Each structure stands twice: as structure tokens, then as C-alpha cells.
């Protein structure tokens, strides 16, 4: 499975994503330590620090946490959009034969976890807002675990996990756009649409300076922030207008250059900061009722059981119907281990959770982050153990 060009594009991301996964673990551990230390109030003060930006009459005032979730994550989704466009033009999504297998797996990996969550929470209208939380996959974390197995991991398995996560990202983008949009403020939406039109015109005029696109995209981000449509979507939309190829410099790609420049920033700065700001749960006053509440239980079981069950069952049906087939060097045992790793929702699940629930309101009843961390932790452990047992080569001792 996969051409040489496709393998090269995947390996270009593997090293940074693997290290990024380790950084995410460290950022999460640091947040939990700070949130449960005698100086836990310093952590709370930090993420709730008010930050205000003014441009003449325009004012944007938010706590630091929301600047991270709405601002920094827009940069992350911009990178996701760039990766999607590149994959569509010349990567793993450019050939139909390479699309069907991960697309079917990703569909199952979103549908079944969501159904498990709904089975726990269908009677609670507030809890229902979290149905999409276990549908996400954190590719950086998953690749970080996969990297622990070294050269034993076949290339086709890395490509399958990466492309499956790409489809997961597409699903997350659509879910955010359709289900987590607040009341619409029409003037803001119209300005955002005008920015999209200008971006289209600039692209058609063959403008290659990425700073022009980013300037217009920044205005679009502000407009979407005010419009009620989640501002992170501005990053994805902006990426679609970045030129793939350069007419002035044949062989150069403005999109690839920008993607290369942003990869390290997203992996080593944006995602660790997001994880640190969103995973600091104070466990000192949490009772067992918080762990057994239907929301965290639905999330944890959706990630731990629903993800691998959904991916494997949908892939099996797809293979039986001859819609697709497994790569020759993979078997159902290794694919099961990979499917368990896909249950590491972490940063993406935390992000969807921040859209679904307001901790100031629901925090006294349940904390969805408990389910995300538990489900992701057990999924990572299960995936590692399964792959360590089924992959050829020397087995790693725990």
C-alpha cells in the first residue's frame, strides 16, 4: 500500500509527530502535577488570566485559555488544512485505491464510539452535546506510541494510521462546523464570507506571497470569532486557498514550504500548550461519582472499546464486500493493535469537549476530561501491548 512519494510524505511527519507525542505526555503530566500541587491556584490563575486586544473600536477580550483554544488551535487547523490539500493533490488521498480503506475505517471509528456515548447519555440533553468527543484521534500521540516499537512497524501500518487520522480530522472539521456553531451574528459572517471571496480572487490571480493570504485569513478569523461560527475553521478554509505550485519558481510549492515551516511550531509549541492548558484536572476533591458519571464513562468506553470495534468491524465488512483489501504485509492482529491506538483521542477530544461543555456550568456535576484521559491512556496501553505481541521482531519488555 502506498507509492514512494506517499511514503516519503508520511515519513516526513513521523519523526516530529513521534517526538510531539512524547511532549504531549510531558505537558499533560506537568498540568496534572500543577493542578494537584499546593500551588494549584497558580495554574488556575495562569489559564484564566484575561487577555485583551484592541484595534481601534474593535475589542477582543478573553481568558488565556480561550485564546489558546480559539487562536492557537486555529493555527493547528491551518496546518491540518495544508496537509489535507497536499494529500489530495499528490499524497495518500490522490489515488482512489488508497482512500477507500482508511475512509471506511475512519467512518467506523467515528460512528461506533459516538453510539456508545449516546447509549450512556441519550436521556440527558446537556450530556448529549458531547456525543462527538470519542470520535476523534490524536495522531501525534498515536504515532508517539507507535514509535516506541521502532523498525518492527511496517510502513503500510504507519501510512494506514496516518491516512485514517486524516479522515478523522475531516470528520472533526465537519462536526465542528455543523454541530458546534453558536448563534450566528450576521455581520461577522458576511465579513468572513467576503474574506473567502477575496482569498479566491487572490488565488485566481496567481498571487504566491503567503503573507497576503495570512493577512486576509487573520481578518477572516476575527470575523468568524464574532460571527458565532467556531474561529478555528478559519484556519482550514485559509489553507484551501494557499497555492500548491509556484509559476514563478517551477518545482517550488508555497503550500509545502508553509507546511514545513509550521510543522515544528504546531508539534512542539501549539499542541503541548493546548494539552497543558486543558488537561489540568484537580483530583483532590473528585469522588468516585465523577469517574462513574455517564459522560466520562461514555467517553472512556467510546475511545477504548468503540474505536477499535468500529474500525475493525467496518474494515472487515469492507473487505468481505470486496470494496477494499488489507495491504499484503498486514493482518487483522496488527490492524487491531493500530485500531486501539486510534482510540487515543486526547488533544482532539479535549478540543471538542471544550466546545461541547462549559466547565463553569458542568464542572460540579462531571468532568469530561476524566473520560478523555482514561480512555486515551488505556487505548495507548492496549495498542502498544497488542502490536508488541503481534509484530515480528524482538518484543519490548514493559
From Swiss-Prot:
- Transmembrane stretches in the record are 19-39, 64-84, 99-119, 130-150, 159-179, 182-202, 222-242, 266-286, 299-319, 337-357, 370-390
What does the record give as the function of this protein? Answer: Na(+)/H(+) antiporter that extrudes sodium in exchange for external protons.
Query: Is Ion transport set as a keyword in this record?
Result: yes
* Catalysed conversion reaction: Na(+)(in) + 2 H(+)(out) = Na(+)(out) + 2 H(+)(in)
InterPro entries, per database record: Na/H_antiporter_dom_sf, NhaA
| Identification of the protein by name | Na(+)/H(+) antiporter NhaA
Q: Which residues form a coiled coil?
A: none
Question: Which family is it part of?
Answer: Belongs to the NhaA Na(+)/H(+) (TC 2.A.33) antiporter family.
Record lineage: Bacteria, Pseudomonadati, Thermodesulfobacteriota, Desulfobulbia, Desulfobulbales
| Gene (UniProt) | nhaA
Q: How does it sit in the membrane?
A: Multi-pass membrane protein
Amino acid at each position: 500500500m502506498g507509492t514512494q512519494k506517499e511514503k516519503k510524505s508520511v515519513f516526513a511527519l513521523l519523526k516530529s509527530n513521534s517526538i510531539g507525542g512524547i511532549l504531549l505526555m510531558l505537558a499533560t503530566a506537568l498540568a496534572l502535577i500543577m493542578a494537584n500541587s499546593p500551588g494549584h491556584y497558580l495554574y488556575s490563575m495562569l489559564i484564566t488570566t484575561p487577555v485583551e486586544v484592541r484595534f481601534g473600536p474593535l475589542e477582543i477580550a478573553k481568558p488565556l485559555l480561550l485564546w489558546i483554544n480559539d487562536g492557537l488551535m486555529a493555527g493547528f487547523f491551518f496546518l491540518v488544512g495544508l496537509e489535507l490539500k497536499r494529500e489530495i493533490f499528490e499524497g495518500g488521498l490522490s489515488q482512489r485505491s488508497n482512500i477507500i480503506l482508511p475512509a471506511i475505517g475512519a467512518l467506523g471509528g467515528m460512528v461506533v464510539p459516538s453510539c456508545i456515548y449516546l447509549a450512556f447519555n441519550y436521556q440527558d440533553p446537556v450530556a448529549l452535546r458531547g456525543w462527538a468527543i470519542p470520535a476523534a484521534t490524536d495522531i501525534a500521540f498515536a504515532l508517539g506510541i507507535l514509535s516506541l516499537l521502532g523498525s518492527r512497524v511496517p510502513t503500510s501500518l504507519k501510512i494506514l494510521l496516518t491516512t485514517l487520522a486524516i479522515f478523522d480530522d475531516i470528520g472533526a472539521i465537519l462536526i465542528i462546523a455543523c454541530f458546534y456553531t453558536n448563534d450566528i451574528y450576521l455581520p461577522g459572517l458576511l465579513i468572513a464570507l467576503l474574506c473567502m471571496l477575496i482569498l479566491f480572487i487572490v488565488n485566481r490571480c496567481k498571487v504566491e506571497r503567503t503573507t497576503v493570504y495570512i493577512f486576509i485569513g487573520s481578518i477572516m478569523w476575527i470575523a468568524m470569532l464574532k460571527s458565532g461560527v467556531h474561529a478555528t475553521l478559519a484556519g482550514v478554509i485559509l489553507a484551501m486557498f494557499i497555492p500548491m505550485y509556484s509559476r514563478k519558481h517551477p518545482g517550488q510549492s508555497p503550500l509545502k514550504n508553509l507546511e514545513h515551516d509550521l510543522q515544528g511550531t504546531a508539534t512542539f509549541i501549539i499542541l503541548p500548550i493546548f494539552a497543558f492548558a486543558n488537561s489540568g484536572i484537580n483530583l483532590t476533591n473528585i469522588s468516585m461519582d465523577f469517574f462513574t458519571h455517564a459522560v466520562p464513562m461514555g467517553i472512556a468506553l467510546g475511545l477504548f472499546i468503540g474505536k477499535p470495534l468500529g474500525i475493525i468491524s467496518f474494515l472487515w465488512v469492507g473487505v468481505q464486500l470486496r470494496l477494499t483489501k488489507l495491504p499484503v504485509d498486514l493482518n487483522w492482529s496488527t490492524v487491531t493493535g493500530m485500531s486501539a491506538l486510534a482510540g487515543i483521542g486526547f488533544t482532539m477530544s479535549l478540543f471538542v469537549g471544550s466546545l461541547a461543555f462549559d466547565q463553569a456550568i458542568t464542572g460540579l456535576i462531571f468532568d469530561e476530561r476524566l473520560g478523555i484521559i482514561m480512555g486515551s491512556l488505556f487505548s495507548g496501553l492496549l495498542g502498544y501491548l497488542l502490536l508488541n505481541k503481534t509484530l515480528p521482531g524482538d518484543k519490548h519488555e514493559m
